[in-house]
């Protein structure tokens, strides 16, 4: 067991709550102590929903453990069915209740209710939230569809051609507390409609039990979020022969690939491969003269597996960034993330320890961080600009405006949200011209945050400097708390630091890295001004 101030994912029963709260007519009875009711706040505060999630807690207390807690479970199940009259009932237990082993699912199944009951067995001590959401969706869909007749001729995704209708698809995976899921559904529905494809149903977001029963009426399943929907789509492929798309349409290239894959599976004519050039502004904006400052920017990417893979492709192929760090907290997505990192010449960071992520971020010295809410906090401490690309997120990442991540419009949103935190090229020239002005010293960078964690680092060891400007020194020491990790064996002398400060701060990080690499190569423990000059000559040769 590990004590932490932050976790990227909640326990699996929170994932089950996400599925139940996303749907209509589904109720979740959760065998849990009173302390586990905190999850309600995730939906009312983060998602800003006007109603509580459809969850009934047994809320047992310590004194109940000496009696028959099974009767407590049965009473709450009975009351929930009578009060809410759900079309389907989910029954499970929290991490604490799992230790009691009351088996609430089996109890509910023996109570004789005339409605579908799905028993959830979510191992709280080995799995987490996204897995819990995936397993809940899989068990719910399987429980509702298992008795449907299977077409003896097999499922034909091209049947629409003979039936004289437009092709139909299901959108599987969008849920509450997902990153921009509502807007993604709207954008992908519009995109498919523009290609003559209808959406049969969306599951689980805003879906009813009747919608789930209609899943097999579609020609194709679209797996929008692999963490949530891949297991469900795989089961439907095995059970009913329904194929599903695997490309996540985030970014111009991925959206084009997504359309090509969907058209191919449905037997439609291939789409125009250059559609994205006139449907999204990202290709033109990223190729414009004003955007040449994007090329080579160092970017660190961390989040859930699906969004990390999409972000890495956009950063590398569409914006010309240099990806210097790639990782995920989702162990279920570790394999594809490792493969993507290997293609970029990196070693993937698979961890749910935010301190390890922050240390890797500081060591990589990025100029932009793409991550979760926690990476935004870490980047702020290090003085690095950041854009949130993945859950877990803050309420400010659930905007009132239309702000998808998928499709052509999603590419526009991504360009704006990733590029705006960066310093524009003209700003760099102006700061270079006026860097000696008191308004442009390191302590007055305002909101720019363009500097990497090590670029803004200035270690003031001289007593005179501390006496003259103690406030600035304390700020600098706070920014450079991570530098010691990366340079524990190297020491900058006073004249070396003084010479380094003469270099414009927006390139200072690169000079520092090169000089330290040069010093390590030469076996030096101290870096003075002469070492700095030698390193400059070495890399300029």
UniProtKB/Swiss-Prot annotation:
- Keyword field: 4Fe-4S, ATP-binding, Chlorophyll biosynthesis, Iron, Iron-sulfur, Metal-binding, Nucleotide-binding, Oxidoreductase, Photosynthesis
Entry's Pfam families? Oxidored_nitro, PCP_red
A biological process from GO: photosynthesis, dark reaction
Its annotated pathway? Answer: Porphyrin-containing compound metabolism; chlorophyll biosynthesis (light-independent)
Q: Which Enzyme Commission number(s) are on file for it? A: 1.3.7.7
Which terms in the Gene Ontology molecular function aspect does this entry carry? 4 iron, 4 sulfur cluster binding; ATP binding; metal ion binding; oxidoreductase activity, acting on iron-sulfur proteins as donors; oxidoreductase activity, acting on the CH-CH group of donors, iron-sulfur protein as acceptor
- Active site residues per record: 290 (proton donor)
Origin: domain of life: Bacteria
Tell me how the cofactor is bound: Binds 1 [4Fe-4S] cluster per heterodimer. The cluster is bound at the heterodimer interface by residues from both subunits.
What reaction does this enzyme carry out catalytically?
chlorophyllide a + oxidized 2[4Fe-4S]-[ferredoxin] + 2 ADP + 2 phosphate = protochlorophyllide a + reduced 2[4Fe-4S]-[ferredoxin] + 2 ATP + 2 H2O
- Residues reported to bind [4Fe-4S] cluster: 36
Per its UniProt record, the required cofactor names are:
[4Fe-4S] cluster
**Which Gene3D superfamilies is this protein grouped with?**
1.20.89.20, Nitrogenase molybdenum iron protein domain, Proto-chlorophyllide reductase 57 kD subunit B
> What class does this enzyme belong to in the EC scheme?
oxidoreductase
Residues given in the record as substrate binding sites: 425-426
Q: What family does the Swiss-Prot or TrEMBL record give for this protein?
A: Belongs to the ChlB/BchB/BchZ family.
Question: What biological function has been recorded for the protein in this entry?
Answer: Component of the dark-operative protochlorophyllide reductase (DPOR) that uses Mg-ATP and reduced ferredoxin to reduce ring D of protochlorophyllide (Pchlide) to form chlorophyllide a (Chlide). This reaction is light-independent. The NB-protein (ChlN-ChlB) is the catalytic component of the complex.
Binding partners and assembly: Protochlorophyllide reductase is composed of three subunits; ChlL, ChlN and ChlB. Forms a heterotetramer of two ChlB and two ChlN subunits.
Protein name as annotated:
Light-independent protochlorophyllide reductase subunit B
